[in-house]
Amino acid sequence: MQFQSTRDPNTIVSSSEAILRGLAPDGGLFVPTAFPKAELEDWKSLSYPELAQKVLAGFLTDYDSAFLGEAAAATYVDAFAGKAGYVQKVHDGLYSLELWHGPTCAFKDYALQLMPKLLVQAKKNLGRTETTRILVATSGDTGKAALAGYAGLPGIEIEVFYPDAGTSEIQRLQMATQAGDNVSVYAVNGNFDDAQTGVKRVFGDASVAEELEKRNICLSSANSINWGRLVPQIVYYFYAYFRLVEQGNVAWGQPVDFCVPTGNFGDILAGYYAKQMGLPVGKLVCASNKNNVLTDFIKTGTYDARRTFYKTTSPSMDILISSNLERLLYHVSGSSAKVAGWMADLAKTGMYTVDAETLARIQASFACGCADDTAGAAEINARFEQDNYLCDTHTAVAFCVAETVRSAAPMVVLSTASPYKFPRDVLAALGETAPESDFAAMAALNVKTGCPVPASLSVLNTLPVRFNTVIEPAAIRDAALK
C-alpha cells in the first residue's frame, strides 16, 4: 500500500514515511492509493486487538503483521478496562459507541495509545536515528492523549499547543500536569484555528526544517493530519457493527447510520474509510455545534470560514478550519489539482466552493446537522431523564442531530468523551447549580447520577502544575525551534 499527497499525485510514500512525516511537503495530507477490502465474515468474531491487527495490516503493508498484532494487544487489552469499542443501547434503534474508557477519557486514546508504537517502528523501518519532535495543536482532548502516549519515549520529544481559555479546566489540567522529561505544553493566546494554523506553518517552513536538521531533529505530527492517527479509528466502526449483530440488534448486512460529533472531520472520515472497505454503513452524520461550518458545507458545497468563532460548551468542536475534510475532497473528486485549488482559495480568501458532482458524491454518504449549547444541554437532560443515560456535551450535540436526521436504520452515536471532563456544564444541564470548581462539580455529578468518576480525572487537582506558559500564535515557530 502506498500513500500520496492530496495535492500532488507525484508525491508517493510508504505507510512508514507517511506516519513519520505527518504532512506532505506540498502542504497536502497523505491518503491511501486504494482501500483494502474487509473480510467481514472472518472478522466478525475477533477480539478488539485481533480486529485492529487486521485493519492495520491492510493499510500498513510495510509493517510486520506480527508487530501490528503485538502493538494492538499492548494497546487495547489493559488500558481500556475491558471496554474497547463498548456499545451501549440507549433506546430502541439508538446506540452509543462509548469511546472514552481509555486512560485519558476521550476517543483520541484509540489512536494515540497505538500511534507512538507505529512511529517508533516507522523510524526502525526507515533506518532513521534522529530525534523526532512532535508538534500537536489541540482543542483539548488530543493534547492529553498525545502527551500520555509519547511521554518518556526515547528519541521522541513532544510539544502541545492549546487555546488559552478554550478548553475545560479538566482538559487544561490534564495537559498542564503531564509528567515526562520529553514533553512541553503551551497555551496559545487565540483559538484552536490559531494554534493549528501556527503549527501547520511551522511544518511548511523550510528554514525550520533546515535549522532542526543541523541539530539532528526532524518534525512530525500527532494531529489527525497524520495518517497514523486515522487508521486506528477505522477499527471501532467495524467492532461496533459486529457487536450490534452479535447482540441481535442489527441483521447481518443491514446498513447502520453513525452520527459523529466532529470539528476537524477525522473521526467521521474514519467511518467513511470503513464504508469504502465494505462495512454496511448507511449515512455518516456530521454533527456540529454553533461553529457549524461543516454543516453549511455539506448542505451547500461552499466552505466559508469567514464567520464568527464561538466558544461553546463542546470546545473540542470549536473549529472553523477542518483539516481532514481535504482528504474527503480528494477521494470524492479524484483530483489533486482541484483539491490544491480549493485549499489555495481557502488560504487566500477564507472560502471555496466545490463543483456540483463533488457535492453530490459527498451528500450520497453524509448527512449533517448542528445544535447550540441550549439544545445540547436539553439533550443531556432528556437522555438522563428518559433513558438513564449520561453523556458529555459533545455527545449531546450528536444525539441532538441524530434525532433530526434519523431514518429507519439503526443509529449509532459516537460518544467521544467522558461526561466528567465537562462536569460543570453537564451538571447544569441536569438542572443543578454547578460549583465554581470542576472537582466539586465532579463530586456533585457523581452524587446526582451515581456514575463513577474516572480515577485519572479525580486526582488531577492533587498533581503539580508543570506548564503555565502563554504564547502568541506567532511564537509557535520559536517554541518549535527551542
Q: Language-model features: where?
A:
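PLP-dependent amino-acid enzyme catalytic core
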Residues: 1-482
